[in-house]
């Protein structure tokens, strides 16, 4: 307590299905967030043997690494249901104020967690690294994934897209 007021720590959670995602793509964002005063947490599946080598490097960056049982496929229901439960526990345990979701399943679970935590004023950011319903995609992708993204957009505070086609599609969503 300083001068009679509490200083709140700011916690942000980065979520992706693959452990190497943060190491390969988010290091500069992590540094930027830390300079802004955020304590950075990273939730991912750390048990995939291919990605184990990055754990020490991520922790040396000052990032709190958390294993969740997230699967790369949205159709692995049991693992993803367990991952959602683990994600909600992290949000509550560390008083997470913002969650930045990456990868399709990370985006799905992160935004669903945001919906379940609306009473906490959790800010939900989703970076779509290319929607799966692009022109020329299989009919299943264009019909099912478009509808899923449209629904999940309601639980998204900030949507970041990386190309013009995705930007135009995102314009049809209600954030």
What kind of feature is each model-predicted range?
Residues 90-97, 119:
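Glycine-rich phosphate-binding loop signature in dinucleotide/nucleotide-binding domains
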Residues 9-79, 165-174:
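N-terminal strand-loop element at the rim of the active site
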Residues 1-7:
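Short, Lys/Arg-enriched N-terminal segments with co-localized hydrophobic residues
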């Amino acid at each position: 307590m300083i001068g009679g007021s509490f200083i709140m720590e700011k916690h942000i959670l980065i979520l992706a299905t693959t452990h190497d995602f943060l190491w390969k793509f988010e290091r500069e964002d992590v540094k930027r967030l830390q300079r802004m005063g955020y304590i950075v947490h990273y939730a991912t599946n750390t048990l995939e043997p291919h990605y184990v080598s990055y754990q020490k490097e991520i922790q040396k960056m000052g990032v709190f690494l958390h294993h969740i049982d997230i699967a790369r496929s949205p159709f692995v229901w049991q693992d993803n249901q367990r991952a959602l439960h683990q994600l909600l526990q992290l949000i509550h345990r560390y008083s997470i104020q913002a969650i930045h979701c990456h990868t399709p399943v990370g985006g799905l679970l992160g935004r669903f967690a945001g919906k379940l935590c609306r009473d906490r004023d959790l800010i939900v950011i989703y970076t779509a690294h290319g929607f799966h319903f692009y022109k020329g995609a299989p009919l299943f992708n264009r019909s099912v994934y478009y509808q899923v993204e449209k629904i999940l957009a309601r639980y998204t505070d900030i949507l970041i897209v990386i190309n013009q086609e995705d930007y135009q599609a995102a314009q049809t969503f209600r954030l």
